[in-house]
């Protein structure tokens, strides 16, 4: 049974990796256009949540599922901490490396978020933006993020979410499931990728459920805030003790 589960998760990861590889070149353009540039503000909020860590010269922050590096670069602005980005999709990392060549000093490492190549307790902060819902197993993914955090280290999760207000939720759902895939498909050449997006968000835990899942996987002081009416949410939690 476990073997079947592992095979299913591996197939999911490969499909997601291949999908992002196919849209890597236009990923940033579509992100900014389809979100009306609101995604930039959301990333700044992630950096603000980690400001006390980013201001420390002895700190290291890991940006997991960093994609084309937008959040890594935002974290790096005016930071004294060392930022490291990881992603399992090489074409996305190639775009990140191009941006990095413009002056930032961020190591980008090809790595799967489910099996990070770092020792236990390596990082003061960990971020994952628009990546957690793409993992094949949310619980195991959160456990892995917990593992690489130091005691009292902070995890910040930025993710597409579920608007709490019924009327807005219905309107947004129509845009997200009917309009966005058509626009995304036309611009990127892959409608499948932008049909996957609303499907993956639908399957992702609602805000309070994600709080519960984070608490169950070793995080304390878990909190969240809805962004832009709840179309995205920012969750954070602190690792207190290692999981048994």
PLM region descriptions:
Residues 114-125:
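A short acidic, Gly/Pro-enriched loop at the edge of an enzyme's catalytic core
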Residues 217-244:
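Core SAM-dependent methyltransferase catalytic element
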Residues 139-151:
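A short glycine-rich, Lys/Arg-flanked "PGG" loop and its adjoining helix->strand segment in the class I
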Residues 60-115:
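Class I SAM-dependent methyltransferase SAM/SAH-binding core
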Residues 15, 158, 162-213, 217, ...:
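C-terminal alpha-helical "lid/dimerization" subdomain adjacent to the S-adenosyl-L-methionine
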Residues 1-28, 176, 187:
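N-terminal, positively charged/glycine-rich alpha-helical extensions of SAM-dependent methyltransferases
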Residues 26, 36-59:
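Conserved alpha-helix/loop element of class I SAM-dependent methyltransferases that forms part
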Residues 27, 126-127:
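Hydrophobic beta-strand segment of the Class I
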